[in-house]
Amino acid sequence: MALIVHKYGGTSMGSTERIRNVAKRVAKWARAGHQMVVVPSAMSGETNRLLGLAKELAPAKTDTAYDRELDMLASTGEQASSALLAIALQSEGMESVSYAGWQVPIKTNSAFTKARIESIDDVRVRKDLAAGRVVIVTGFQGVDPDGHITTLGRGGSDTSAVAVAAAMKADECLIYTDVDGVYTTDPRVVPEARRLKTVSFEEMLEMASLGSKVLQIRSVEFAGKYKVPMRVLSSFTPWDIDIHEEAKSGTLITFEEDEKMEQAVVSGIAFNRDEAKISVLGVPDKPGIAYQILGAVADANIEVDVIIQNLSKDGKTDFSFTVHRNDFARTMDLLKEKVLPSLGASEVIGDAKICKVSIVGIGMRSHVGSASKMFRSLSEEGINIQMISTSEIKTSVVIDEKYMELAVRALHKAFDLDQA
């Protein structure tokens, strides 16, 4: 008997009929003798609906008190879907109980709307499992040291599921979604994209950080830190599919690099539309400038991605970096109001119409020429590269967003990713 964690996304929970199918699938696993913990997302569109109501009431509000109420509001979406799934399981003859994050409890810090999990108390869940119940834990949320409900940010249910799996020392965490695994790139952009049977943890971490929507990056970080066995598979296969066939479907996230994986120089093309570029011009070229700029941004809980500092000329330089597009206006205001006056820079400019395109592959460690091949391919399509970022197993470029799909298709073809 294994302890298995299932996570279901919003599309998988998108209607009562789909919730019923999820219940049948979970019941099948439980009847096969497994202890089952399920982490569902809110029903598709529900979180956006709830946050939209808040925006109607306070369009421009952005402070801690407001963010606290947003978390109270948004958390109800997962609470509703969890209770509905428990009811559906009970209708299938399965003993089941649902818990909100604060009831478990899943303990987080106090960063409302972007909280991070600090610990999970597994006593209550283990007691229910020992009694033969299926336990449903709300994704996306927890409770801070002061008893306030917090949410983990977009995609937080993935993180919840992997964190629960880590805390429970689960045998496997299965992430059910609306796609049947991890692909070489988004099939909606490149129809020839292939599903990967396995992908290394490092590659998945890079893909998640670079914009792949299959898994949320913090969930992959958790999986890597605690060595949680993880698989991505489709919730739209028939619920009564043979359980052994289902257990081997989708894409396995592996922590071992086998020979076949070594042979692939590039495993996938990732892209992210949600980027914005900010440039601080005419910055005095002296020690501490990077900290003055990025320290203030970090203090505002804004994540920075690609960073470039130009060569100095006449004692001045330009400093550019990218942030999430949702943080663009806030970052611009912060720099203009609090940083620019004390910095001695000439101005701050921004561009929210950019995107990031990346090639990823563990084979890049031991093969040269992948970056130049990428640059040549983009050049042949007339695509200008604005910024470049590299690591051992990825190369990313920032380009005009209107060329994103062209760039992805060109790179997918250049690296022969349509061929097995």
Task: State each model region's role.
Residues 1-220, 310, 399-400, 415, ...:
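Nucleotide/pyrophosphate-binding catalytic subdomain
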Residues 32, 92, 226, 300, ...:
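Conserved dinucleotide-binding and phosphotransfer motif residues
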Residues 40-51, 183, 232-258, 315-316, ...:
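Terminal amphipathic helices with adjacent charged low-complexity linkers/tails
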Residues 43, 179-181, 226-230, 234-239, ...:
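Glycine-rich beta-alpha junction loops
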Residues 172-176, 230-232, 305:
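Short hydrophobic alpha-helical runs that function as membrane-insertion/retention elements
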Residues 223:
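Acidic-aromatic/histidine active-site loop/patch
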Residues 243-420:
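A conserved regulatory-domain signal marking ACT and ACT-like small-molecule sensing domains
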